[in-house]
């Protein structure tokens, strides 16, 4: 069975900020760490990276989550084309302060003085041991992420669409159903197995965030990781849900 390809290496998002009233559409690499991503946002929004708080909103402009793990990759969050990332500034600057460029003081600074400052991108990266100051750790993280993705792909490739299965997820009783989808999704990174349960024990109807992956009744569909799925001869069980 063939599994769909990997996600695009870049993503196009809208950037908004508590310091201005406009939005910018930008494309970024999913392999950026959140710390590196903040550094790229500095010139765009006018807030120091160390004073940023990031919030992720979906294409429907509903809040998803905070991007608060400095060493996490941007692609590890459910960031899709059309999403919005909002920058909350904690530096004390006022709304609109950086929109009027005539009010911005222009000056030069020596290399030594710049190195001594504690509020620069360089000092932030040095303190956090990120970016080019910790290339070894970043390379290791990327290698580990690639290894996990390869392992998931191998597991997913052994789960045919249409096969009967049993799902044993942590904290849940075993659930039986039929495999309806295998591959990558838009809502979260990695490989996922779409299952149509025999009874309404799921969370959806085969669609997530408006995108349909397979057809089933409401509450019969679920997406789980390949590691918790076992395919085989699993006939339907009587869960007793029709009893009064």
Swiss-Prot record:
Modified how: Phosphorylation by PAK1 is required for normal function. Ubiquitinated in the presence of GAN which targets it for degradation by the proteasome.
Location(s) in or outside the cell: Cytoplasm; Cytoplasm, Cytoskeleton
Expression sites (tissue/organ): Found in most tissues.
Any single biological process term in GO: post-chaperonin tubulin folding pathway
Modified residues (Phosphoserine): 65, 110, 128
Modified positions (N6-acetyllysine) in chain numbering: 219
Record field: transmembrane: none
GO molecular function, a single term: microtubule plus-end binding
CDD domains listed in its UniProt record: Ubl_TBCB
Residue list for modification N-acetylmethionine: 1
Disulphide-bridged cysteine pairs: none
Residue ranges constituting the CAP-Gly domain according to the UniProt record: 183-225
Function: Binds to alpha-tubulin folding intermediates after their interaction with cytosolic chaperonin in the pathway leading from newly synthesized tubulin to properly folded heterodimer. Involved in regulation of tubulin heterodimer dissociation. May function as a negative regulator of axonal growth.
Family to which the UniProt record says this protein belongs: Belongs to the TBCB family.
Known partners and oligomeric status: Supercomplex made of cofactors A to E. Cofactors A and D function by capturing and stabilizing tubulin in a quasi-native conformation. Cofactor E binds to the cofactor D-tubulin complex; interaction with cofactor C then causes the release of tubulin polypeptides that are committed to the native state. Cofactors B and E can form a heterodimer which binds to alpha-tubulin and enhances their ability to dissociate tubulin heterodimers. Interacts with GAN. Interacts with DCTN1.
Protein name: Tubulin-folding cofactor B
Originating organism: Homo sapiens (Human)
Gene: TBCB
């Amino acid at each position: 069975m063939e599994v769909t390809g990997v996600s695009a290496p870049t993503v196009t998002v809208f950037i908004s900020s508590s310091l201005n009233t406009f939005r910018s559409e930008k494309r970024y690499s999913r392999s950026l760490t959140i710390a590196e991503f903040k550094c790229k946002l500095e010139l765009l929004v006018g807030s120091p990276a160390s004073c940023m708080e990031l919030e992720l909103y979906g294409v429907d402009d509903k809040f998803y989550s905070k991007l608060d793990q400095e060493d996490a990759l941007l692609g590890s969050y459910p960031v899709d084309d059309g999403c919005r990332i909002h920058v909350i500034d904690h530096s004390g600057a006022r709304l609109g302060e950086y929109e009027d460029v005539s009010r911005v003081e222009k000056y030069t600074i020596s290399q030594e003085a710049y190195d001594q400052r504690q509020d620069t991108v360089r000092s932030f990266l040095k303190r956090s041991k990120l970016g080019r100051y910790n290339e070894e750790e970043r390379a290791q993280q990327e290698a580990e992420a690639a290894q996990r993705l390869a392992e998931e792909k191998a597991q997913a490739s052994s789960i045919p669409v249409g096969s009967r299965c049993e799902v044993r997820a942590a904290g849940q009783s075993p659930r039986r159903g039929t495999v309806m989808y295998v591959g990558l999704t838009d809502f979260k990174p990695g490989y996922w197995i779409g299952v149509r349960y025999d009874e309404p024990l799921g969370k959806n109807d085969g669609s997530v965030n408006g995108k349909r992956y397979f057809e089933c009744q409401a509450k019969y569909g679920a997406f789980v990781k390949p590691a918790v799925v076992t395919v085989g001869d699993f006939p339907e069980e009587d869960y007793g849900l029709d009893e009064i």
